């Protein structure tokens, strides 16, 4: 019996093993079938094998303007020069094969031995806690990837790469594959292909490379950006030195070089390192350097973010991808603006070439359609400057001077209801008790010109750019609040330096030289658009979409904005900004007045290093900057500092051109904005003694109309007869409180009571009707005010 039980047990064990084996086999076979199915699906989704694109992949990307007309071609032969297989030194061919694909002439597109070796090494690395993965791509696979596929690190792309490599090997020779590979491979910086790399690193043609130089270039594909940066900066040079030695070792291992040549090369490197003669490739100038370069920069950045690819891969996509990039530039307006900046002899008194042949003073202009964020004009300098020149419209920080006031002082004060457009301030030197809060020595800025006029409203202070009143308002508002608004407007403000500086936040004297604070014309143009866009800051965009050569949309810029202030505050600021460009005595920007749609503000930094004008219309916002690249003072022929009126004049010329075929229109007034008459001296309800020319109609955010009567003059002015009964009750309470005061106050009470008898005193009222100097168009407005009753 015992033997029978043992036999049964053994039989059951065999049965279980067979069942387990069959199950595992079924799972394996099912997995293989599933994997094969997935693989076939991936292969079917692969792009067609276009041999011509593989062997001749240089299809240029192009840039269009806002009317879809071609304005620039991105790629040029100076990025890459084709070299035939016969003209490439054997050492360079052998170096690439040794380090990149040692069995290149033996496989048919895929090196299976290398694939399995890399697979097991990667598993081993994973078990050991190492993150580095080893690739197994052949030269054929790399060529297919660089010319037909994306750079995504995904299984699907890898399967397609292997499939297309096998197909390619069936149709072309090894020599053709190697030639195409060497002419397309990214090798750091702007060099694509071996000829461009030879000139970039050694200043010679590829046919003249020696053994060490060939080994250096063949080692670059592993990490072109890293080796390029090390070569150009001469820092961490051991990176490319060790890589070059590794290539030489591989060449010796595969008998491409003799032991003698290997030993001599290693000894030379140990003694002399690798003598480089680096230089930037002579890139051809684009038709629209300032605008098109910015488009290329933004497209590169967005490709990297959207598809998680490296800078080198993004460059390759732009230069060889045959992309169609639809820009936002208004070509005719860009041309007009550039021509205006290039011909300032009648405006600017200085036109020297002091800095490396660059004309001085320099200038920049940006124009934005703030409703969409589309940039229409972007000019970073005067004259035809070399390719990749410094773009002053986007790449620098300068102190904005008084153009900052609407952003960090007046706008925030009205938005937070700290002030109104009618708030009255004393145009007089800043009191010591305020000044000492902001400097070791009491901060005591001066007006420019150094004139003080006493009481005036916020509106008049902005029109005349009164520095001392800006400081007084910022003191009430608080530096922290001013800095927060500045950042929301897009200014770069360093908290440790300018975030606590009264001079920086109230007068725009930001620490631009440090490179950590300031703005540029694109930033300032976008910021001023807030006042016409219901308080929203539109993200500036220089292109609308990018389409690849198959018609697929790779990138699309959708409208994006952020709220900066209320629509009511933005509208009031928009109206306030008509003051500086008016022809009123004391207005600082009247030279910018191209017509009734003009709004804006001047700005001048310390010692006239920066001259600004920024403003807007119902159509566009724009900014103009003039200055010197070395931040030196801007003076006239008599050594006197020059003001910002020249920037205002340039702004007028360019914005006038932008609006020459546009109909007059206005900005819609929000429902939350109301109107009332005020005294322009006190900012309060006019009294019967307020001079006729001091009574002005003003805008207010609902609920902020002043309740006090002018104490600068005497008498009472009924500003709100048509308000509800609650307001009348408040007025009656005020009368009761003053009942026992002197005769003058009694007269005020009587005058106020008389306003309730409009029909009885109608003739008298008409006789004494106030003639407003700047009465706005009332045909479409409902005003919450009445005419004065005395």
Curated annotation (Swiss-Prot):
GO CC terms in record: plasma membrane
Residues exposed to the Cytoplasmic side: 1-20
Location of the region described as Transpeptidase in the Swiss-Prot/TrEMBL record: 363-656
Segments crossing the lipid bilayer: 21-41
Catalytic center residues: 100, 402
Membrane topology qualifier: Single-pass type II membrane protein
Compartmental location: Cell membrane
Pathway as given in its UniProt record: Cell wall biogenesis; peptidoglycan biosynthesis
Record's keyword terms, sorted: Antibiotic resistance, Carboxypeptidase, Cell membrane, Cell shape, Cell wall biogenesis/degradation, Glycosyltransferase, Hydrolase, Membrane, Multifunctional enzyme, Peptidoglycan synthesis, Protease, Signal-anchor, Transferase, Transmembrane, Transmembrane helix
Compositionally biased spans, kind Basic and acidic residues: 741-779
Residue numbers spanned by region Disordered: 720-790
EC number: 2.4.99.28, 3.4.16.4
GO MF term set: penicillin binding; peptidoglycan glycosyltransferase activity; serine-type D-Ala-D-Ala carboxypeptidase activity
Reaction catalysis annotation: [GlcNAc-(1->4)-Mur2Ac(oyl-L-Ala-gamma-D-Glu-L-Lys-D-Ala-D-Ala)](n)-di-trans,octa-cis-undecaprenyl diphosphate + beta-D-GlcNAc-(1->4)-Mur2Ac(oyl-L-Ala-gamma-D-Glu-L-Lys-D-Ala-D-Ala)-di-trans,octa-cis-undecaprenyl diphosphate = [GlcNAc-(1->4)-Mur2Ac(oyl-L-Ala-gamma-D-Glu-L-Lys-D-Ala-D-Ala)](n+1)-di-trans,octa-cis-undecaprenyl diphosphate + di-trans,octa-cis-undecaprenyl diphosphate + H(+); Preferential cleavage: (Ac)2-L-Lys-D-Ala-|-D-Ala. Also transpeptidation of peptidyl-alanyl moieties that are N-acyl substituents of D-alanine
Entry-linked Pfam families: Transgly, Transpeptidase
GO BP term, example: cell wall organization
Transglycosylase, as annotated region: 61-230
Superkingdom of source: Bacteria
Residues on Extracellular side: 42-790
Composition bias type Basic residues, residue spans: 780-790
Keyword Translocase: no
Biased composition (Acidic residues): 724-740
Biological role stated in the UniProt entry: Cell wall formation. Synthesis of cross-linked peptidoglycan from the lipid intermediates. The enzyme has a penicillin-insensitive transglycosylase N-terminal domain (formation of linear glycan strands) and a penicillin-sensitive transpeptidase C-terminal domain (cross-linking of the peptide subunits).
Family of the protein in this entry: In the N-terminal section; belongs to the glycosyltransferase 51 family. In the C-terminal section; belongs to the transpeptidase family.
Protein name: Penicillin-binding protein 1A
Native species: Clostridium tetani (strain Massachusetts / E88)
